[in-house]
């Protein structure tokens, strides 16, 4: 496990723990306790957990794209799963407020959660409804 994967896994667990301890207390008045934390979670996970099927194909010779693909491939399934679990825990506790962002994220991450249906996607096994 490289340094980034190690850090992201620990950071993900810390985010989940902070959500669990937050309970019904709000971080900002008028928001669910996990919104602010999981907004950051969504952003971070979108940087490395999503691997579009066309971006990493051999036809793309851009060094930047290749670097991005290597960056994605270096991430561990554990850290991706923990990030996803954190998002799911927020969704269940903040259904109405988090409804739209959750499904936007879910759509953008289609190949992560449904890796068997699209080529070139990161193989991740998550229990998803």
Swiss-Prot record:
It is found in: Host membrane. Its main location: host cell. It comes from the Viruses. Keywords: Host membrane, Membrane, Transmembrane, Transmembrane helix. One of its GO terms (cellular component) is host cell membrane. It is a multi-pass membrane protein. The chain crosses the membrane at residues 3-23, 27-47, 85-105. This is Putative transmembrane protein 10. It comes from Sulfolobus islandicus filamentous virus (isolate Iceland/Hveragerdi) (SIFV).
């Amino acid at each position: 496990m490289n340094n980034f994967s190690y850090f992201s896994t620990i950071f993900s667990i810390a985010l989940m723990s902070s959500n669990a301890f937050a309970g019904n207390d709000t971080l900002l008045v008028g928001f669910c306790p996990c919104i602010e934390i999981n907004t950051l979670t969504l952003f971070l996970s979108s940087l490395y957990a999503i691997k579009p099927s066309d971006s990493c194909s051999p036809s793309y010779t851009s060094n930047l794209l290749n670097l991005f693909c290597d960056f994605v491939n270096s991430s561990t399934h554990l850290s991706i799963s923990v990030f996803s679990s954190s998002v799911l825990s927020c969704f269940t506790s903040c259904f109405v407020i988090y409804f739209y962002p959750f499904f936007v994220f879910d759509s953008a991450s289609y190949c992560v959660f449904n890796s068997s249906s699209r080529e070139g996607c990161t193989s991740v096994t998550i229990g998803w409804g």
